[in-house]
Amino acid sequence: MSEQNQVVTPSDAPTDAELQRARKRLDALWRRGTEFLGTQYAILGGAMSWVSERNLVSAISNAGGFGVIACGAMEPARLAEEIQATRALTDRPFGVNLITMHPQLNELVQVCLDAGVGHIVLAGGIPPGAAIKAIKEGGAKVIAFSPALVLAKRLVKMGVDALVIEGAEAGGHVGPVSLTVLAQEILPHIQSVPVFVAGGLGRGDALVSYLEQGASGGQLGTRFAAAEESIAHEKFKKAFVRAAARDAVTSVQLDERFPVIPVRALGNEGGRQFVSHQADVIRRFQAGELTREAAQLEIEHFWAGALRRAVIDGDVEQGSVMAGQSVGMVTSVQPVAQIIEDLVEQATVALVRQQRRMDADG
């Protein structure tokens, strides 16, 4: 285990018997998730555009987790190529994340089915019933995101096979509710399908707490974005290592007439310029220089290509350095296998300590 993630001192180090007992408990807690995914650990890699491609996805799967390709704006032929390239690097299960608003969603679903992808994640809105039907008839499992209990119940009725509940602590596009609250709202009431938690997860002991509430596993994105196997630029990774939790902030909206989709990223010069840009656009709108529609487009277009500039080009000042609040727990660039090993060990030690407290009280 890496030095920066050590969780015990020699004086309280668990015995082999304690560790064995705790691992059995952990295996039981996330068995539903591991059986659903076909993996050793119920740890999913969050799909991140420009980051979650063949190298990172295969590394997560090879380490016992479940890697997920981020399709993003890929065309069908490009996605087919990425799936094939990932298969060349791992013989273990992995999934594909598709954006429901993609104009070629049906074709992308078929690409996944033709390639034998066993799990398809539908993100970015309520998935079309036709897509869910096609995926299930094609023999694959459907995973969907739910930001509220009412939607979770609706998705289950629509036939999804598993849910991800993602809190506002996550990086990228986020909702307004924390994972702590979502878990309390949803986990007690959705038991017919596996539910995976996401948003702010950086340590295994935190994951254990959600498993004990009824979650089937966890999804982590920020923790893997700066892994050795990630193709992200070194400047992007260094920004993660330097950052504290408070540095991952959501985008600012100046005027409710011009909505801004909330995105959590590291604060930088680009973010500050975005605020100034909004103020200028609003001034021009109020002066009659822009229509409301034109003003909205000018605001939305500010970040065009910004994620690629940060991830691929390493422009961490003008680009969008999407990161969740768990970025403060990214203290070095590590191999994926080490990250997962640390998470599992932290979870195991947390269960050992829990058992010790119970024994002491008993």
Which residues make up each language-model segment?
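Active-site entrance/lid segments in N-terminal catalytic domains of soluble metabolic enzymes
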Residues: 2-194
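Residue-level detector of alpha-helix initiation sites
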Residues: 51, 201-202
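Conserved active-site-proximal phosphate/metal-binding subdomains
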Residues: 2-13, 178-196, 202-362
